[in-house]
Amino acid sequence: MIAQTKIDTKTTGGGTDQIQIAMTLLVRDEADIIEDNIRFHHAMGVDQFIIMDNLSMDETPQILKRLSAEIPIRIIRQTDDDYDQGTWVTDMARQAAQLIGNGWIINNDADEFWVPRSGSLKLFLAAL
């Protein structure tokens, strides 16, 4: 699911350097894939990540902390065992909108990889 906020191409000039992309992920015990996911999407043009970790018992929290030293990641520790996905994802989307303002927000799962034909999420989104 992609949530869009309007991009004013008159203001941005329509260039991909002006497009901001944030990705949200709700994760739990994703140590086997989370680093690959974040590195891949960062290389594809995602500027900011907001990642909510819900009670991971594996190395996911340590991986996120290590990656946040080199990639813009806002880590949210969700310790509530009442799984409230709708509320949590909405909260992450709101935080992403505050971070990037007039840009794009992609809600993603740790095992999903967005592979645009153009080779760049920014090029793909600029063409829309």
Set out the residue ranges of the language-model regions.
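Active-site-proximal specificity loops/subdomain of glycosyltransferases
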Residues: 61-107
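Short beta-strand/loop segment that forms part of the nucleotide-sugar
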Residues: 47-55, 76-79
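A generic secondary-structure signal
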Residues: 40, 94-96, 127
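The conserved acidic donor/metal-binding loop of glycosyltransferases
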Residues: 109-114
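Short, acidic, metal-binding catalytic loop of nucleotide-sugar glycosyltransferases
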Residues: 39-48
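N-proximal low-complexity "stem/linker" segments adjacent to membrane-targeting elements
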Residues: 1-39
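Conserved donor-nucleotide/metal-binding helix-loop-beta segment in metal-dependent transferases, i.e.
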Residues: 117-128
